[in-house]
A protein has these predicted regions:
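Beta-propeller folds
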Residues: 1-286
Length: 286
């Protein structure tokens, strides 16, 4: 109803403010809108914005509404339009919308955007050689985006950057077999290799998820020590979950277990305390 539309307008409307943490001064950026994303580039020179645009559909959830993805200057001036995404009300079951998705800054570059695009029309049953591709666009965002990588299956994760700055950890998923392939991609040269693969249903052999650390620019990279990166997991076993912390060779197969919870209590890695030689874990017992 019109009342539902008015409620959505009211609850989704927001303003963007820059806040000086020292003095508490604030500065409004842009106009009031229905923002779903506002993220500065690593060097602070640009702002990545996504805002919903009406009319509002009563058939799909809000994250399928039409939206505009833009790059602004820090004072709210439009620099470039990245994508005008239409209402996604005809997405196939298990499919994805058309156009750029998972749009984000490269954590280890001043101002470079990456995103994923479907090559199969978003239709998971379409017969194609590749389903997705990874795209790159650098400032000033007025040229054509560059294709970096083509995936045979659907890309489901692209947010893990290594300390060296040029390597992206990307995950693609084979839907029918419920299988995942984890790639390492050099986004400067385009070189890529499968690091490891896993069965989604084999919880006993699940290697877990990467541990991250924040950069001074507010973005995140993999927690890394030399050629080793850190993984944490729930540690499913016949005795129940026994969470663990591992150190894995980046691009290789060597793994070192640093911690695993005892079977008579429940413990899990929480965070590193300073360097990689100390960490905090939580312990629970009955």
């Amino acid at each position: 109803t019109a009342y539902d539309d008015a409620l959505f307008d009211y609850h989704m409307s927001s303003e963007l403010l820059l806040v000086d943490p020292a003095g508490g001064r604030t500065q409004t950026i842009g106009e009031t809108a229905h923002y779903t994303m506002a993220e500065f580039s690593p060097d602070g020179a640009y702002l990545l914005i996504e805002r919903l645009v009406g009319p509002w559909s009563h058939e799909v959830a809000w994250w399928r509404f039409a939206s505009e993805v833009e790059v602004w200057s820090p004072d709210g001036q439009l620099v470039a339009s990245i994508a005008s995404l239409p209402l996604a009300d005809a997405v196939p079951i298990h499919g994805v919308p058309l156009g750029p998705r998972v749009i984000d800054w490269r954590s280890t570059a001043p101002h470079t955007l990456f995103w994923v695009e479907a090559l199969d029309g978003g239709n998971p049953v379409a017969s194609v050689s590749h389903r997705d591709r990874l795209m790159k666009l650098e400032a000033p965002f007025d040229g054509e985006a560059t294709e970096i990588f083509r995936a045979e299956h659907r890309i489901i994760s692209t947010g893990a950057w290594t300390d060296d700055g040029a390597t992206l950890m990307l995950t693609e998923r084979e839907r029918i077999k419920r299988w995942r392939y984890v790639w390492l991609i050099d986004v400067e040269t385009g070189e890529s290799k499968v690091w490891y693969d896993l069965d989604e249903d084999d919880r006993y052999n699940d290697p877990g998820n990467p541990v991250y650390r924040p950069l001074d620019n507010g973005h995140w990279v993999l927690r890394q020590k030399g050629d080793m990166v850190y993984f944490r997991g729930s540690g499913a076993s016949p005795e129940g979950d026994r969470p663990f912390l591992d150190r894995r060779e980046l691009g290789g197969s060597a793994t070192e277990r640093l911690f695993r919870c005892d079977p008579d209590r429940y413990e899990y890695f929480n965070a590193f305390a300073g360097d990689e030689n100390h960490f905090v874990f939580r312990s629970e017992s009955s």
